[in-house]
Amino acid sequence: MESQQLSQHSPISHGSACASVTSKEVHTNQDPLDVSASKIQEYDKASTKANSQQTTTPASSAVPENPHHASPQTAQSHSPQNGPYQQQCMMTQNQANPSGWSFYGRPSMIPYTPYQMSPMYFPPGPHSQFPQYPSSVGTPLSTPSPESGNTFTDSSSADSDMTSTKKYVRPPPMLTSPNDFLNWVKTYIKFLQNSNLGDIIPTATRKAVRQMTDDELTFLCHTFQLFAPSQFLPTWVKDILSADYTDIMKILSKSINKMQSDTQEVNDITTLATLHYNGSTPADAFEAEVTNILDRLNNNGIPINNKVACQFIMRGLSGEYKFLRYARHRYIHMTVADLFSDIHSMYEEQQESKRNKSTYRRNPSDEKKDSRTYTNTTKPKSITRNSQKPNNSQSRTARAHNVSTSNNSSGPDNDLIRGSTTEPIQLKNKHDLHLGQELTESTVNHTNHSDDELPGHLLLDSGASRTLIRSAHHIHSASSNPGINVVDAQKRNIPINAIGDLQFHFQDNTKTSIKVLHTPNIAYDLLSLNELAAVDITACFTKNVLERSDGTVLAPIVKYGDFYWVSKKYLLPSNISVPTINNVHTSESTRKYPYPFIHRMLAHANAQTIRYSLKNNTITYFNESDVDWSSAIDYQCPDCLIGKSTKHRHIKGSRLKYQNSYEPFQYLHTDIFGPVHNLPKSAPSYFISFTDETTKFRWVYPLHDRREDSILDVFTTILAFIKNQFQASVLVIQMDRGSEYTNRTLHKFLEKNGITPCYTTTADSRAHGVAERLNRTLLDDCRTQLQCSGLPNHLWFSAIEFSTIVRNSLASPKSKKSARQHAGLAGLDISTLLPFGQPVIVNDHNPNSKIHPRGIPGYALHPSRNSYGYIIYLPSLKKTVDTTNYVILQGKESRLDQFNYDALTFDEDLNRLTASYQSFIASNEIQQSDDLNIESDHDFQSDIELHPEQPRNVLSKAVSPTDSTPPSTHTEDSKRVSKTNIRAPREVDPNISKSNILPSKKRSSTPQISDIESTGSGGMHRLDVPLLAPMSQYNTHESSHTSKSKDFRHSDSYSDNETNHTNVPISSTGGTNNKTVPQTSEQETEKRIIHRSPSIDTSSSESNSLHHVVPIKTSDTCPKENTEESIIADLPLPDLPPEPPTKLSDSFKELPPINSRQTNSSLGGIGDSNAYTTINSKKRSLEDNETEIKVSRDTWNTKNMRSLEPPRSKKRIHLIAAVKAVKSIKPIRTTLRYDEAITYNKDIKEKEKYIEAYHKEVNQLLKMKTWDTDRYYDRKEIDPKRVINSMFIFNRKRDGTHKARFVARGDIQHPDTYDSGMQSNTVHHYALMTSLSLALDNNYYITQLDISSAYLYADIKEELYIRPPPHLGMNDKLIRLKKSLYGLKQSGANWYETIKSYLIQQCGMEEVRGWSCVFKNSQVTICLFVDDMVLFSKNLNSNKRIIEKLKMQYDTKIINLGESDEEIQYDILGLEIKYQRGKYMKLGMENSLTEKIPKLNVPLNPKGRKLSAPGQPGLYIDQQELELEEDDYKMKVHEMQKLIGLASYVGYKFRFDLLYYINTLAQHILFPSKQVLDMTYELIQFIWNTRDKQLIWHKSKPVKPTNKLVVISDASYGNQPYYKSQIGNIYLLNGKVIGGKSTKASLTCTSTTEAEIHAISESVPLLNNLSYLIQELDKKPITKGLLTDSKSTISIIISNNEEKFRNRFFGTKAMRLRDEVSGNHLHVCYIETKKNIADVMTKPLPIKTFKLLTNKWIH
């Protein structure tokens, strides 16, 4: 606005420059209203300082900081205008002003404002100047500038000093709104203060210091007019100005008062809202304070009505006065006076009670007689958590005040109900009654009454939020509710047995009920006034009655002692009994930690010790109530049963007669354990333990030997530690009489330090019980930890140290404290603890290369003693490190799931437990660049030699006779022949192919499993109790772990625990590195199998129910309850048998160690649970050896005639290079050439059949006019690139007929001779399987057709020439093609376009979009595969009509019309199908396999044992380089091509259970080691043994006319080379398996969840395409389901929270998956891992697991 004014009017005529005024901003935290004399000098100094820092010159003017300031412009001189005030402009400075005078000094034109028309307004003349003040001392405005030293005198002097540097004060902003006037006044007052006019401004507390002058008044008026336009002034300001325009000071004074009044109002409201009164001050003072506040607010125009005022007052009441909240909050017409009357009454009664408190004080001797857990010396308060509320991070809080004694003081915590001024009913004893009340004791025998309790009455409690009662006699509708936990004021838990209703029947026949909690662990029955108020019942202590809000009296109140009571006669009894309450089944709370998890977390300590520790806070972070103890009583830990098996218990208290009482750390017990044999040299063989007699604090130290100096070093260390850390001196050390303690060196050391050695007497083992029991306990823990984690034996002392840390933190049942508490140390924070052996990933600070993985798999051992880190074992580095740079590996539970643990994993519990600690670590981490070489905090403590441990029973290696026979090619001459070594590059592209499932270079594996000590009798004691207790409450997440060994075989016996095996490698017994494990019978075998994903376990009675598959419902994907049931129904899922009790055989001895190999195989791989162990035995069941192939391939060269020749050059093959070259393999030739079939064929009969087939083919070619027979071309006349070589090929068809085919050599066809954009389409196998499945469900007729010489019906557009057939004898001539000859690049596409056009135009068909070669109309569906057609229709006549039309154009043969109602056999595209309409369909290849497999020259074992699985877990492909002769290598590759080619053909047709093994071996075609060949033979042997198996379909009988398409997905995390994951999917239509896929993930996944997401995302596109196909072929509605055993994946899919995807590698894929699931209406359901049939697609499985998952759909 100001800029516009400057541009519209001419500048003033005086001055040569227009300088902008700037100043330093005044601090915003300074209050401009504080204008007291003490602040004036401060503002003056600030103004002077600000002015001294700003300069303005004519050449450069400062940019104005105020947006209302005019931009600097050059002033121009003009002659004065005629008449006064004809120009308007902003008041501008024409020259610099002296310090102390701001914003005037030269004539200025002030713009007119409406109120300038006032008669009181006196405008200045055009040449008049602003007032000038005389330069006198003491005048603030006349202070000369320190820079110039001049005083502002006149305009001429000012003009002469125009160029001098002056300081200016920032003007106030323009007023823009009436609502902002008070804020503007603040800035205006600040402006006046900075202009040295602060002393003329009055404040709310004092008048102005001096009177203003006329010049100052003119200045105020002009500046006020300038910056406060009248249109923006408030009404009250305009009223003042209308009366006296110059009364600016009145406006400022009133504004200051208003602002201070507003501040006081805010303070009053804040004080009123934060009132607090507990009786510590007189009630009169409290009333006066509140009344004054209410009066001030009312006077300031803020009236507070009675209701609001009472609410403020009641909110501030605490202590005993809190009761008034409940007594008065229901009153509608409540007044402040009434409320204060009650407060005065309670205050007077409180004072009276204090004076007479000795009368009611409880006798201290009576307190000692109270033997209850809750002594009730103070009032306990209870906190209630309702775990049934999902997504509620804050617990519900309840206060249950349990009072048994009178309170000695008043305060906020003493929430008792006091009497009023009216005399209450006083009972001096239990027999004294008033008001005619009857004290009738309930017939129920109460427990634990307090002496001051009034029997038969309920204690009224004003502070309790819940009602508690000890007897079940009055509880209605009782049910257990363990989710509600109550604690008293001392934070002690009050166990709650049940929850129910407490029903009242009052004296006016009023009936009501409130909720009540049942517990026998309280001193009184508590009645919560809070819950009574919720049902409109209040306690009036002036009348001593319970009444309703309308004043209706319900029951009298009795005062007995210090408390108020209500009789139980108003309670209605129930029929429930106390045993019924106590025996109600406790349901599982999902928010609680399962006891097995805590049991394992705390080193497998017993439940009693853990409970004592949690109750006494020796274990911190969570409470006893946070653990589900429902299974603790009958829970049997299998690892504890094995690791802690003992003969008998020690005698308790046996040492008391040998010693006196000592102070802490004065009496120590010590003992040495060892040696432990068969360990690396770096691992300790002994340990020495110390136990303090008083505190029971334990220390353990490792020892490598028992020499004197080693023992002395430990004693020196422990004594110094106790002296420095605990300021104590050891007086006595009790030891046995071992030589390590009785030697002279140690004796002198003890004597020198004044320590008395106390030795045990001979044959008195009881005297040394403390040390012996500690060693036994620690060893039990050690065995249990190693058994549970599966870590190698050389880490045994780490398990001892972990146990010691935990044991020192567990409370003793006898002392109720832990050793750490006795020693004065803080409790152990369990959030910093990890389970022993927990898989983690440790950051590699210095990798081998920038592309090398930065994470190293490891296993957590125990917290570090020397840092805040954790000791972690890294198998790949053979080290233990001390580091904080680790991440817990999700889904990994080491060997926790070995015994199934009732199908428990604890990922969610562990995440929840360590969340705060991890967040603390994360918040204190320093971000560092990955490219910098920074010193790591890794402390490599020991170099561990990881050589395999030798088992105690040496295993003999089984060698077949052929194994000892050396190959005939390895002769003396071969050593003298030079070798041509060919090496492949070491590093190759990891993405070799879509199904790359090969081992990479050696990586770390799971360390070997420790041996288990046998008992003295040579075997484990037989356990008559089951090792496993079913716990169906717990859900689990996917978990996988790696453990590698070659010493594994299948076990014939099988328990339900094995159903979760995953990622178990293929095994073979023929390899050179294999070791044969002695046979073990079923009765003598203990299954030790690591599960991939322990799943939800249910009770045996529900093993066959649908509850094994738990659907996850969402509003988007599952709109109806029965949708999930319909999806799961009819699926060929396995029926899980009930889990039998697992018993250990008497002959059970010891487990052989797992010989860990540092490899990463595709048949198991790192991160997978693929290890299991059998027990050594001389016997072995028949099925245990069924995967063994006795025929060795060492006789290979005996069949080769070239073996008689001198050895040739050898070729060295590297595994990775061979894998990379797999995709470039040329297919092997399965047909015969002309010379092989006819010219040189010595089989006369076969030769004649081939000749007949040859002539038949030639006649067909001539009949179809395949080439131009009118002219033969000379070869020289034709462009060579248009000449196509041709040949005859011969083969024998499946039906036994001999076939000849004249084909072109399309493999050498020039690119210019065909259109590369044309596609040769055939029906997709999934389309065929879908059509077959729909045909079975809809009773379709299936007709099979064949079109002879189909390609020859398609014309060829290009100009191509071929050589004539051989029988014509014209080798130098060429003929021009007219038809699409077989073999040409374009022939398939030409035929496809030809037949497609005919079917659409002539037969009325249409092709299904997205599914080539699938045609349909309203009646018929056609699947086309080159020249084979399969027709499906409801009416057979529809098929016949299509056939007639086809015969009109093509030579069509009906292979099978399909008109019979009996079983019909088809041979469709290699599948042998048995079909009976409306009943079943069976798909197999028995006849074809019976014919083909024997011709493969595979060493079959037809009379031997049959294989029960395609491969066995435990063996890894040796990655060492091969060195083979060139010819030998080519022959083996050729054989591998034949074998894998046949297996792939079978697997992708219908044997989907073999796809994992097929894909794995397919990657090793160019790496034909003896091991790979033997594994391939084993696969072919299994196919041969199961050649009669069929894919079985039965007609579905859906409840609704709908189709159900389901995909079951699974992933095996990180079990492939380069840490890639294997994914597998199985597709089912109406419960029938129609396809499967097993492949390696295209990207490296970082977690099991990401692998599962990748697997599901790979399945969704095909699922959607199949859905479209089904809807096109069958117009029924379709339901699409997606089943996975990963709950975390389901949670991500159904969640609407997108923040969890941030900083996640799989965020994009997960978001896309969520969109696809939502957009395509997919129903995402959970399936147990035990029932996940897709498991066979991702990993090798044990025999019984494999059978269990496949026997319902392949048999």
Curated annotation (Swiss-Prot):
GO terms for molecular function: aspartic-type endopeptidase activity; ATP binding; DNA binding; DNA-directed DNA polymerase activity; RNA binding; RNA-directed DNA polymerase activity; RNA-DNA hybrid ribonuclease activity; zinc ion binding. Residues 583-640 are annotated as: Integrase-type zinc finger-like. Residues 299-401 are annotated as: RNA-binding. Residues 1338-1476 form the Reverse transcriptase Ty1/copia-type domain. GO terms for biological process: DNA integration; DNA recombination; proteolysis; transposition; viral translational frameshifting. Its EC number is 3.4.23.-, 2.7.7.49, 2.7.7.7, 3.1.26.4. GO terms for cellular component: cytoplasm; nucleus. Residues 1610-1752 form the RNase H Ty1/copia-type domain. Capsid protein (CA) is the structural component of the virus-like particle (VLP), forming the shell that encapsulates the retrotransposons dimeric RNA genome. The particles are assembled from trimer-clustered units and there are holes in the capsid shells that allow for the diffusion of macromolecules. CA also has nucleocapsid-like chaperone activity, promoting primer tRNA(i)-Met annealing to the multipartite primer-binding site (PBS), dimerization of Ty1 RNA and initiation of reverse transcription. The aspartyl protease (PR) mediates the proteolytic cleavages of the Gag and Gag-Pol polyproteins after assembly of the VLP. This is Transposon Ty1-NL1 Gag-Pol polyprotein. It comes from Saccharomyces cerevisiae (strain ATCC 204508 / S288c).
